[in-house]
Amino acid sequence: MASTADFKNGLVLKVDGKLQQIVEFQHVKPGKGPAFVRTKLKDVVTGKTVDKTWNAGVKVETATVDRRDMTYLYNDGSSYILMDDKTFEQFELPLDAFGDAGRFLLENMRVQVSFHDGEALFGELPVSVDLRVEHTDPGLQGDRSTGGTKPATLETGAEIQVPLFIETGNVLKVDTRDGSYLSRVNN
């Protein structure tokens, strides 16, 4: 059991018999009336998000979730194949297990997978990854109609917006949470 004061992003709760992960939360103390907590919860099985409001101080049942370090091996077209780094056991995860961040997965990348009662729930990539630019058009110095960015295709096939000075072959640091360009990595 946890109180609403213990809420943090990533915490997994049991709500109405379903496992739901806190994506966002906000403590609200209105001028009149009791304090409450607004949350955005994501169902770990279906991926659907719902908004839920809790009175401050309410006890909520939490789910025991273990996180294991794993290595991403490959995508067989219908699922991701991962290997536990300690036991070398292989696991299958559905293609939506990493959410939108799955487009940044590279073979042999280390990831974390969350388990509940022995069942794999979802995976998480590191906050940032280094990826090589496979293709991007040359940036023209005078071309500012696009706000100083251009599309670039990364080695995983993902397309992101990058500054005009980025060239094909550059290695970039990319934020896996929102797919944004962070910096160019020195080779």
UniProtKB/Swiss-Prot annotation:
Subcellular location: Cytoplasm
InterPro entries given in the database record: Elong-fact-P_C, NA-bd_OB-fold, Rib_uL2_dom2, Transl_elong_fac_P/YeiP, Transl_elong_KOW-like, Transl_elong_P/YeiP_cen, Transl_elong_P/YeiP_CS, Transl_elongation_fac_P
Keywords: Cytoplasm, Elongation factor, Protein biosynthesis
Keyword Translocase: no
GO biological process terms on file: peptide biosynthetic process
CDD domains (UniProt xref): S1_EF-P_repeat_1 (cd04470), S1_EF-P_repeat_2 (cd05794)
Entry GO CC: cytoplasm
SUPFAM superfamilies: Nucleic acid-binding proteins, Translation proteins SH3-like domain
Record's keyword annotation contains Cytoplasm: yes
Gene3D superfamilies to which the protein is assigned, alphabetical: 2.30.30.30, Nucleic acid-binding proteins
Family classification: Belongs to the elongation factor P family.
Described function: Involved in peptide bond synthesis. Stimulates efficient translation and peptide-bond synthesis on native or reconstituted 70S ribosomes in vitro. Probably functions indirectly by altering the affinity of the ribosome for aminoacyl-tRNA, thus increasing their reactivity as acceptors for peptidyl transferase.
Descriptive protein name: Elongation factor P
Organism: Corynebacterium efficiens (strain DSM 44549 / YS-314 / AJ 12310 / JCM 11189 / NBRC 100395)
Lineage of the organism: Bacteria, Bacillati, Actinomycetota, Actinomycetes, Mycobacteriales
